[in-house]
């Protein structure tokens, strides 16, 4: 994950000081891209330990179409707690938009089901897209989508994915997002009888919070380790039937975790 460290270093050394919604303050650049060949290892940060349980359960929760944190809480995942209301509700966020995008005539579109079917039936389509950025429902969301839009691409029997992330918390958020969408790409590739190609991460406002500077310096001082490989233990009937125990990262070694506050 040298690419990630190069990205972090670039923003830390060359970013512009900016204010932000949370009042924390950031150092930021606009526009950055990283490309990861998923055949060279699973792109998980090794210069600090990631909570893989949270990454996997969050993705499974998105795929359920859920907007309530109960599933996450039941599985020991707390990453959405700060934004949920007293009943655990978050409004029409990622999972709802992925699985039940509302139409003007009262129907709902399951974007995940549709994109998987399109990949199978028309892999050369340039419309293999899922969007969470529903302008009409943003006011009802506790947190508007940071990773807002993703597109698939099939070539030479391999599935690639590109994510556009409008707001990128480089220290805390981006490592989760890279791993999550790489995992989703592997899952959909398996469901569509394809190999994996590249995961392309594209960021808009790419920032380091001012209260993460010390942690960033620590992380930049560490040498990355060899990437692990992802093992999916079996193929379920659909993209929605994967379970936490279906996934194993083989050979994952990392430096110790680095704690940092979340800007809410």
Swiss-Prot record:
Protein's pathway: Pyrimidine metabolism; dTTP biosynthesis
UniProt keyword annotation of Methyltransferase present: yes
Annotated binding of dUMP, by residue: 21, 126-127, 166-169, 177, 207-209
UniProt-listed InterPro entries: Thymidate_synth/dCMP_Mease, Thymidate_synth/dCMP_Mease_dom, Thymidate_synth/dCMP_Mease_sf, Thymidylate_synthase, Thymidylate_synthase_AS
Reactions catalysed, as given in the entry: dUMP + (6R)-5,10-methylene-5,6,7,8-tetrahydrofolate = 7,8-dihydrofolate + dTMP
Keywords: Cytoplasm, Methyltransferase, Nucleotide biosynthesis, Transferase
Subcellular location: Cytoplasm
Record keyword Methyltransferase present: yes
CDD domains the record matches: TS_Pyrimidine_HMase
Highest taxon above the source species: Bacteria
Example of a GO cellular component annotation carried by this entry: cytosol
EC number: 2.1.1.45
One GO MF term: thymidylate synthase activity
Binding site for (6R)-5,10-methylene-5,6,7,8-tetrahydrofolate: 51, 169, 263
Transmembrane segments: none
GO aspect biological process, one term: dTTP biosynthetic process
A Pfam family reported for this protein in Swiss-Prot or TrEMBL: Thymidylat_synt
Active site: 146
Role noted for this protein: Catalyzes the reductive methylation of 2'-deoxyuridine-5'-monophosphate (dUMP) to 2'-deoxythymidine-5'-monophosphate (dTMP) while utilizing 5,10-methylenetetrahydrofolate (mTHF) as the methyl donor and reductant in the reaction, yielding dihydrofolate (DHF) as a by-product. This enzymatic reaction provides an intracellular de novo source of dTMP, an essential precursor for DNA biosynthesis.
Family, similarity comment: Belongs to the thymidylate synthase family. Bacterial-type ThyA subfamily.
Quaternary assembly: Homodimer.
Alphabetical list of NCBIfam families matching this protein: PRK01827.1-3 (NF002497), PRK01827.1-5 (NF002499), thym_sym (TIGR03284)
Record's protein name: Thymidylate synthase
Encoding gene, per UniProt annotation: thyA
């Amino acid at each position: 994950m040298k690419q990630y460290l190069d990205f972090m270093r670039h923003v830390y050394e060359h970013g512009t000081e900016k204010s932000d919604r949370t009042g924390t303050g950031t150092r930021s650049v606009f526009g950055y891209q990283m490309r990861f060949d998923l055949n060279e290892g699973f792109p998980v940060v090794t210069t600090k330990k990631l909570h893989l349980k949270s990454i996997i359960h969050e993705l499974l929760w998105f795929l359920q179409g859920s907007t309530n944190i109960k599933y996450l809480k039941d599985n020991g995942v707390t990453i959405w707690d700060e934004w949920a209301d007293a009943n655990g509700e978050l409004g029409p966020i990622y999972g709802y938009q992925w699985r039940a995008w509302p139409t003007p005539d009262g129907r709902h579109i399951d974007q995940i089901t549709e994109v998987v079917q399109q990949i199978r039936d028309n892999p050369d389509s340039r419309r293999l897209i899922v969007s969470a950025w529903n302008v009409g429902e943003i006011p009802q969301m506790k947190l508007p989508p940071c990773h807002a839009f993703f597109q698939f691409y099939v070539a030479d029997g391999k599935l690639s994915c590109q994510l556009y992330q409008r707001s990128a918390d480089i220290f805390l958020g981006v490592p989760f997002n890279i791993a999550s969408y790489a995992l989703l790409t592997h899952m959909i590739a398996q469901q569509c009888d394809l190999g994996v190609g590249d995961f392309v991460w594209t960021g808009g406002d790419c920032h380091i919070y001012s209260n993460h500077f010390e942690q960033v310096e620590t992380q930049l001082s560490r040498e990355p380790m060899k990437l692990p490989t992802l093992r999916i233990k079996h193929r379920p009937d659909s993209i929605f039937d994967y379970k936490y125990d279906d996934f194993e990262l083989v050979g994952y070694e990392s430096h110790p975790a680095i704690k940092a506050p979340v800007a809410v």
